[in-house]
C-alpha cells in the first residue's frame, strides 16, 4: 500500500488544527508511526504528475467542472504510477482512467 504525498499534507493540516490534548497527541503520534513504517511508499507529486494533473484540470474546466486542486494532484499521482485509488470521495475521481475504490461502501 502506498499513499500520495498530498494525503500526508491533508492529514498533517487536520492534525495541526485540532485542539491540543490527548486525542490530538494520540493521533499525531500514530500518524508519525505510520509514516515511519511506509516512508518509502509515499508517492510524490513530481513533473509527470503535474503535467497529468494540468491536463485533467484543463479538460475539467472545458466541461465546466471545477475540482479541488488537492484531488487533482492526487489524480496526477495515481495516473503517473498507474495505481488504484482507495478514497471515500470516489465521485471526485470518476473521470480518471484508473480503478477507484470506495472502501466505505464495499
What does each model-found stretch correspond to?
Residues 79:
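Short alpha-helix at the nucleotide-sugar/activated-sugar donor binding site of glycosyltransferases
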Residues 1-76, 95-98, 104-106:
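PIN-domain endoribonuclease scaffold, especially VapC-family toxins
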Amino acid at each position: 500500500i502506498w499513499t500520495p504525498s498530498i494525503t500526508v499534507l491533508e492529514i498533517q493540516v487536520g492534525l495541526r488544527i485540532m485542539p491540543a490534548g490527548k486525542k490530538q497527541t494520540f493521533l499525531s503520534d500514530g500518524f508519525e508511526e505510520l509514516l515511519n513504517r511506509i516512508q518509502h511508499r509515499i508517492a510524490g507529486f513530481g513533473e509527470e504528475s503535474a503535467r497529468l494533473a494540468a491536463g485533467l484540470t484543463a479538460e475539467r474546466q472545458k466541461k465546466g467542472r471545477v475540482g479541488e486542486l488537492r484531488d487533482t494532484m492526487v489524480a496526477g499521482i495515481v495516473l503517473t504510477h498507474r495505481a488504484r485509488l482507495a478514497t471515500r470521495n470516489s465521485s471526485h475521481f470518476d473521470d480518471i482512467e484508473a480503478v477507484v475504490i470506495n472502501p466505505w461502501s464495499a
